[in-house]
Amino acid sequence: MTTVYYDQSVTKDALQGKKVAIIGYGSQGHAHAQNLKDNGYDVIIGIRPGCSFDKAKDDGFEVYPVDEAAKQADVIMVLLPDEIQGQVYKEEIEPNLEANNALVFAHGFNIHFGVIQPPENVDVFLVAPKGPGHLVRRTFAEGSAVPALFAVEQDPSGEARDLALSYAKGIGATRAGVLETSFKEETETDLFGEQAVLCGGTTKLVQSGFETLVEAGYQPEIAYFEVLHEMKLIVDLMYEGGMENMRYSISNTAEFGDYVSGPRIITPDVKDNMKAVLDDIQKGNFSDRFIKDNQNNFEEFHKLREEQHGHQIEAVGRELRDMMPFIKSKSIEK
């Protein structure tokens, strides 16, 4: 069992007296910046001109272009989309790094796959909250927190680990617990979870179930309720108490069907396909494909997105959600 670090575990405040630059002021950026500021740390924001620039100023921060923020800071947290981090780092951050600066990430993609290669005299570590930015901020304000992972990749200063834990405590994560990992483990497991289960696996499972019912002559609206709408109810039960809690909470009919039909859907072949997905991630095949498509203006990405937008389940869902005012609809119109 891995060690979990809590507030009382972090006795040295290695972040005190250092200037922290948060690069990016999106979902994670605003949460990290505001939590650190509320805990008394010296925080500046580095972003390009735009709406986020104005928002950060309105929130009371000193806001600078990325290169100037990097030049001023001792600790630089990069909270930009994966696909633009490499260019921003090369053009605006790297020229302004000094020995014993700390370069920090919330996801290991660009370090692990070599897109960003920091100089050897710079600390490199990761602090990755396991939740979206709005939840990181809201739970902090309520006195609780979202758990996080941390990892150290380079430690020329000898204090990267202390800095990582101090940063995690600064954003509130040690209230809930912080687990140590590596850039390799965080990156590969995160990508696998997204592709095989949370996003890719779940969406294809739901779509296939919907299509099976509709093709068999059932009403699309009924199919939507059975395979998508009720998904949240089941996931919430697992989230709150694991699979045992879910099975305890459903009917005996549903539980029996779980046992006898689940293995018919998720067969050994499906697990073999999952292993192939993991292998692609580990070998860098997925990252190469993503990076090359980014360099090609995301031609494949945009094509795939457009194909999925037109699926019948989306149109049916938009109509049904209009019937349920208790759902805060977030339909994406194009």
UniProtKB/Swiss-Prot annotation:
Mg(2+) 2 binds at residues 190, 226, 230. Its cofactor is Mg(2+). Pathway: Amino-acid biosynthesis; L-isoleucine biosynthesis; L-isoleucine from 2-oxobutanoate: step 2/4; Amino-acid biosynthesis; L-valine biosynthesis; L-valine from pyruvate: step 2/4. Pfam families: KARI_C, KARI_N. GO terms for biological process: isoleucine biosynthetic process; L-valine biosynthetic process. InterPro entries: 6-PGluconate_DH-like_C_sf, KARI, KARI_C, KARI_N, KARI_prok, NAD(P)-bd_dom_sf. Keywords: Amino-acid biosynthesis, Branched-chain amino acid biosynthesis, Magnesium, Metal-binding, NADP, Oxidoreductase. The lineage of its organism: Bacteria, Bacillati, Bacillota, Bacilli, Bacillales. This is Ketol-acid reductoisomerase (NADP(+)). NADP(+) binds at residues 25-28, 48, 52, 82-85, 133.
